């Protein structure tokens, strides 16, 4: 609490300093407060940003988000360059006004709550998460579709930067209760049955007694299991749809045509230390079972180890492919797809494949065409 109060004080001091030049009015005898240096002003904004890069929402969150934005706006261009987390406000991720947060009241008796981890990339949020929400609303016109994000840190980012308010799970469920919703279906856009899905279920079940019925749907890839060779129908459907979209986006006639051209498709997922990481091995087994020999599954986190970039690169090279198409195995092509996969800098998957000279990566002369997430491709709505 003391730190939160300090952050708010810093914000007020910074904004006041910028607008008054830290001087008193003419005729006043109070001593002038020394003006902040550019470095101090930038550091104060970094402190304000750090205060809202948290997973817990508190009574101070709204004020903290507003204070951070006001402090940022009060900086000069030169001062903004000194803010270590400057991209928090400065990075252009698209037009937030095109996104519908779906936080309206007047829900009715039946609600379909679409729960996503979330993304602060505006274009990805509109295309991927919004794509799923709109498809579900079209499929179930008698139900009111609403949104919730599980990542408070992302909710705060969007609120501070764009002034867009998105409900977290508790807010969305309480909104449903307050609106007299009787039947609620919770549809996660999470890819797999991991730690985040477990937490989602736990939060939802705390409200279960306040509805006549509550159904919590499975994530996109369905049940996990423990055997990497045992694959459910959901994974088969996702594999077929995702590969078909990748082939279409590449402008190829078929996956076999890409194979004949020496091209592999590499899907990059997130990865997890949760026991559900066997899902990625199951997806690789599914690709092989379908005869998709030139399709490989990797993860940012390299968990399981067989999905780490060096291992995937070895597998692609050993299979004799010299060209690679990178695609996100994620419902949302947000931060990971843009920064960990497609960015042309050391440590990314693009760089990892291109740097050694063994491979050509789609878009290597410019920027990698990372493709949309599975949400925008409506893969999730085909399952």
PLM regions: where:
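Acidic, proline-/serine-/threonine-rich low-complexity intrinsically disordered repeat tracts
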Residues: 27-35
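Positively charged n-region of N-terminal signal peptides that target proteins for export
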Residues: 1-10
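Short, glycine-/Ser/Thr-/acidic-enriched flexible segments
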Residues: 3, 72, 331
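C-terminal motif of bacterial Sec signal peptides marking the signal peptidase cleavage site
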Residues: 17-21
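Bacterial signal peptide processing site
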Residues: 23-25
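Beta-rich interaction/scaffold domains
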Residues: 34-97
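Extended amphipathic ligand-handling, pore-lining, and cofactor/metal-binding catalytic surfaces
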Residues: 89-325, 330-383
């Amino acid at each position: 609490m003391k730190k939160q109060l300090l952050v708010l004080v810093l914000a007020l001091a910074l904004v006041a300093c910028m607008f008054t030049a830290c001087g008193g009015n003419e005729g006043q005898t109070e001593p002038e407060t020394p003006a902040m240096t550019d470095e101090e002003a930038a550091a104060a904004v970094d402190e304000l940003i750090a205060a809202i890069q948290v997973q817990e929402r508190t009574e101070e969150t709204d004020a903290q988000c507003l204070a951070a934005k006001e402090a940022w706006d009060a900086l000069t261009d030169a001062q903004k360059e000194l803010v270590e987390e400057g991209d928090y406000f400065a990075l252009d991720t698209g037009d937030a006004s095109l996104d519908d947060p779906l936080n309206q009241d007047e829900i009715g008796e039946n609600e379909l709550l679409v729960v996503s981890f979330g993304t602060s990339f505006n274009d990805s949020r509109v295309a991927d998460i919004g794509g799923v929400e709109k498809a579900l609303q079209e499929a179930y016109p008698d139900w009111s579709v609403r949104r919730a994000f599980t990542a408070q840190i992302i909710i705060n980012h969007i609120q501070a930067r764009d002034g867009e308010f998105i409900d977290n799970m508790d807010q969305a469920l309480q909104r449903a209760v307050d609106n007299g919703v009787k039947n609620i279906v919770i549809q996660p856009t999470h890819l797999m049955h991991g730690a985040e899905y477990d937490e989602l279920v736990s939060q939802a079940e705390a409200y279960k007694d306040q509805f006549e019925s509550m159904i919590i749907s499975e994530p996109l890839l369905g049940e996990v299991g423990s055997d990497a060779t045992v694959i459910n129908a959901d994974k088969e459907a996702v594999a077929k749809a995702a590969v078909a979209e990748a082939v279409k986006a590449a402008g190829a006639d078929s996956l076999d045509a890409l194979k004949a051209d020496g091209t592999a498709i590499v899907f990059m997922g997130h990865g997890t230390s949760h026991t559900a990481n066997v899902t990625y091995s199951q997806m690789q087994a599914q690709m092989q079972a379908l005869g998709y020999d030139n399709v490989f599954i990797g993860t940012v986190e390299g968990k399981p180890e067989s999905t780490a970039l060096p291992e995937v690169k070895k597998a692609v090279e050993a299979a004799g492919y010299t060209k690679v198409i990178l695609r996100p195995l994620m419902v949302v092509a947000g931060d990971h797809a843009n920064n960990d996969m497609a960015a042309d800098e050391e440590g990314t998957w693009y760089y990892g494949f291109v740097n050694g000279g063994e491979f050509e990566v789609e878009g290597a002369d410019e920027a990698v065409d990372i493709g949309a997430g599975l949400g925008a491709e409506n893969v999730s709505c085909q399952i």
